[in-house]
């Protein structure tokens, strides 16, 4: 299922062409543990670009490890259904109860570098997140709350404001890509 999703995805930029190629290579190299954190080189994760129905606001959280405003998301932890992972992570990390995929198709993909850090008292070596991103929609009137062991705040941002709120230059590029795609979708409303 995962291989088919990645193979079926049509990249529209060089970053995605190369990242897609490498994800497929990693699937071949690590067939047994690419979905789990047991693979300390690279493993799959899922993220969500959560927009309101008007598609002019995006839900972000202040990530405790990265010390930056970021999208919700998390590790596959053995789960091959990464859309399901993205939905679960949004609910867990933001308190949002009602949300839906704008489409079940992959919205973007990217290989993200993760620096060494300490999580729950354990040292985590530098590694790669093979990340699949899904476009989700939620009513921005819903109550949100943080998940203190992972983030310290959750709030809605205007699209441009969300990009600027990130303190990670490499993630600003990703968030801008997602916003640019959203602008293209607004005309055709999925």
List each language-model region with its residue ranges.
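Unchanged
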Residues: 77-173
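Generic L/I/V-rich hydrophobic alpha-helical segments across diverse proteins
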Residues: 6, 24, 175-178
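Acidic, metal-coordinating catalytic segment for phosphate/diphosphate chemistry
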Residues: 10-47
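Short histidine-centered beta-strand/loop micro-motifs
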Residues: 59-61, 74, 145-147
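Generic N-terminal amphipathic, Lys/Arg-enriched alpha-helix
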Residues: 1-10
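N-terminal strand-loop-strand
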Residues: 36-71
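Charged phosphate-binding loop/patch that engages nucleotide di/tri-phosphates or the phosphate backbone
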Residues: 166-190
